Amino acid sequence: MYNFKHITYKEIPKLIEYNKQTYPERGGYTKSIIDFWVARHSEAVSDILTVEKDGKFYGQEFYSKMAFYYKGVYEESHWCFDLIVDQKLRKDCIGLDFMQYALEEYPNYYCTGSGPDAVKLHLALGKQLLGDIRKYVGLVNPLWLATSLFRGKIAKSKYPRTIDHVWRKVESFVEMPKLEQPFNVNLFEVSRDAEFFQWRFFNDFHPYVVYVNDTTGTYFVVTTIVQKHITAIVLLDFRCSLNDTKAFEQILKATHKLANKIYIPIVICGSSHTLIDRVLESNHYISIGRPRPIIGTKKYKGAGYEKNKKEQDFSRCTCISDQFFNHWEYC
């Protein structure tokens, strides 16, 4: 009989081996990724669920504490990702049973990136489609294409201290302004609490760089990745007002200047809001790949996702998924 359970610290080595087999494309990073994950807080390990039989894992799902604002009201929840059940068990509905177990443990969960079959299961369990995230790619300066070949990731020390005397590079978490209120009262906006921000963007696992506007309190986070041997810059996360296009246009302009300063030809950005779509497309960005669905709680039915996307007021604003960039997805 297959058991569904929360794992313990002593089972971490077994979890690492299961992930090596399940996600071979992660290569030697598997242990580092899981170690990074469980280092977030004392309960991080127990928020990992597994399908287990006779001491062997056959499936998993990771949950993480998150919080969001909706209509200005703060609510705690969980984000889930890396849901997988071994292929041979799916015909026996083990995956659905596992998801039902997870729903009992984490009833108010959100997720993104699910494939078509998983989306059907989420919806069958009472969740709803709230929107989607699109991956955009823009060519900022073709002159740097040759110099970015085989260059690798860019170290934090190579980024400028300021951009246009407006954006300041944040060297440590203590320099960050407190993010205690939403930038957009009428949107679904995922919170950026201090514990999350310090763990996620001020770590030694990956060279994230944070820039902040001390006048407005807006910020953005960038990093570099290598795809097809070309180094690109990723606009990974940001917060700003979306009442109009101005604030995000300033962030995008700063990102373009930054890319030119460190000789990067390509910028990658995700969008879960129609306003951001418009700004990116007006700057000749191209949407590539399939839109990644955002799944959430049923009680927000009617609050948001419109298939024509003309007036979408329920949106992640903006949580760009690392999954787009060959890392773990986390919001």
Model regions and ranges:
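Extreme N-terminal starter segment of soluble prokaryotic enzymes
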Residues: M1-F4
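Active-site/acyl-donor-binding loops of N-acyltransferases
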Residues: R40, K65, N108-P160, V221-T245, ...
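Conserved GNAT-family N-acetyltransferase fold
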Residues: L49, G59-E61, H78, L83, ...
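Amide-forming acyltransferase catalytic core, primarily the GNAT-like/NAT-type
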Residues: I7, E11-G55, K127-L236
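Conserved acetyl-CoA binding element of GNAT-fold acetyltransferases
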Residues: Y74-Q87, I230-L242
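N-terminal/domain-start segments enriched in small and hydrophobic, helix-friendly residues
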Residues: K31-H41, E61-V85
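Contiguous, function-dense segments enriched for cysteine-driven chemistry
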Residues: L15, S42-A44, E61-F62, E75, ...
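Conserved acetyl-CoA-binding loop-helix of GNAT-fold acetyltransferases
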Residues: D82-E104, T245-K257
